[in-house]
Design a protein with these regions (language model features):
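Catalytic acidic motif of RecA-like/P-loop NTPases
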Residues: 11, 24, 279, 310-314
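Loop/turn-to-beta-strand initiation segments
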Residues: 301-303, 332-336
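Amphipathic alpha-helical domain-onset/packing element
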Residues: 231-254
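Helical segment within the ABC ATPase nucleotide-binding domain
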Residues: 318-330
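C-terminal structured domain segments
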Residues: 364-401
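H-loop/switch region of ABC-family ATPase nucleotide-binding domains
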Residues: 338-340
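P-loop NTPase switch/coupling surface
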Residues: 1-205, 346, 352-373, 391-392, ...
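GG-anchored amphipathic helix commonly corresponding to the ABC/SMC/Rad50 NBD signature/C-loop
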Residues: 41-44, 270-306, 315-320
Length: 432
């Protein structure tokens, strides 16, 4: 069963009900609510991580006075405010719900007088049994041992993955990345000097992104990518890593390096440019590429929520970044992409089309578009967000994104051009 999401009256979204597929794209006008949907999905898919955080906090404080169910509920409500802002989640009639399976779900709603966070009966039963388990003497004694807590939480994480029907780590990559990249050399200092109140000025998704970037940057400074490649023994994954690296170089026009804390782009002629002096396109896309590539070569199944991967990129690079995302998805990961770009949507359609060709044409198709990047229609979905509602924009007959969603503005521009060109001719067809 796929995860299922419902939203009512949250921000610009009036109503939304959709299945969360393995590979999904949201398109539509700016400020239509694409990011709102993406953030709600991130919020619910990170519940299992929040459960681990709540358990860790209770153990470290040795305060078990609050039942785990109540502690998690309180934690999720606080995160709701940090993710969407108090005003957005205080509107009477606001509802968000997420079904992981038919038996495991979470519903959050706002009434006239109170907010309500409900867990399904089976989820409540699981939390109660977990509560009883890790408070018992035997388990508690093991947790006090060296590495005991880490081993216990690692075991529980696998159980949570099964419970929530989700084996992926969720990574949110927001839009507006260039300013964060531009300041990256100062982030370690700036972030370490902020108190909790100052950090709360960032929405939860942006804050998580910053922390993930800082962590990955520290790994790159220790040559983590090369070491990961050196230990990669899976032949198929090594082949995919080479193809992914080729696409990455096409997009970035170089290679990201971090030397003594200084981030640079190493160009093809071996010269290096400090990242804060690189192009806006490179600054926007560099961490998209780094996250995709590292998770690919370390084979850590991830659910990538990527906002506007096309930002500040030339159309050819938009095509390549779409192919890279698709390659990574096919390697055992998953992704949600928000986009305004007809080039991204067009590239996706080509990859969908390639996978549906007759068997005797697949070899030729592979020579045009690498089969590792093809998109299976069975695991793909696309939605158009407009006027607060979401509509399926897949043409199910041909199994592609409805071309009218991509070509709407082109037809307007072409019509305007035709009308302007007509002004150059008089009623008798003579050029004026």
């Amino acid at each position: 069963m796929e995860h299922h999401l419902k939203i009512d009256n949250l921000g610009p979204i009036k109503h939304c009900s959709l299945d969360v597929s393995n590979y999904m794209v949201l398109t539509g006008y700016q400020a239509s609510g694409k990011s709102t949907i993406a953030k709600v999905i991130y919020y619910f898919r990170s519940v299992k991580d929040e459960l681990v955080a709540v358990m860790m906090k209770q153990f470290q404080s040795q305060d078990y006075s609050t039942p785990l169910e109540d502690a998690l509920r309180r934690h999720l409500m606080e995160k709701l405010y940090r993710t969407f802002g108090v005003a957005a989640v205080s509107v009477p009639g606001m509802k968000i719900s997420y079904s992981y399976t038919k038996d495991i779900w979470i519903h959050i709603s706002v009434g006239e007088k109170r907010k309500n966070c409900r867990f399904s009966p089976q989820l409540k039963d699981f939390l109660h049994s977990l509560d009883n388990e890790y408070r018992t003497g035997d388990v508690h004694a093991k947790l006090s041992e060296v590495n005991g807590l880490i081993e216990y939480l690692a075991k529980k994480t696998k159980e949570f993955n099964l419970l929530f029907n989700d084996s992926y780590e969720t990574i949110y990559i927001p839009a507006g990345r260039s300013i964060l990249t531009l300041l990256s050399s100062q982030w370690n200092y700036l972030y370490s000097t902020m108190d909790d109140a100052q950090k709360s000025l960032f929405d939860e998704c942006t804050r998580d992104y910053i922390e993930n970037v800082l962590l990955l940057k520290s790994l790159y400074s220790r040559d983590y990518e090369r070491k990961s490649l050196d230990t990669l023994t899976d032949a198929h994954l090594r082949d995919l890593s080479k193809k992914a690296d080729t696409l990455r170089n096409f997009i970035l026009k170089g290679r990201y390096v971090c030397e003594n804390g200084t981030e640079k782009i190493e160009l093809s002629n071996s010269s290096k440019v400090d990242l804060n002096f690189a192009s806006s396109g490179q600054q926007e896309v560099v961490w998209v590429l780094n996250f995709l590539y590292i998770r690919l070569i370390t084979h850590r199944p991830s659910y990538f929520i990527i906002e506007e991967p096309e930002s500040n990129l030339f159309p050819a690079s938009q095509k390549y970044v779409t192919e890279l995302i698709s390659l990574v998805v096919n390697a055992g990961h998953a992704s949600l992409v928000t986009t305004h770009s007809p080039y991204v949507l067009g590239a996706m359609n080509n990859l969908l089309y390639a996978s549906t060709l007759p068997t005797d044409k697949l070899k030729e198709a592979d020579s045009i578009l690498s089969k590792e990047c093809w998109i299976s229609p069975d695991c793909f979905s696309s939605y158009f967000v407009e006027d607060g509602v979401v509509s399926d924009c897949i043409d199910h007959e041909i199994k592609q994104i409805d071309s009218s969603k991509m070509d709407a503005i082109s037809s307007i521009v072409n019509d305007e051009y035709d009308r302007l060109s007509m002004l150059m001719w008089d009623d008798k067809g003579r050029n004026v």
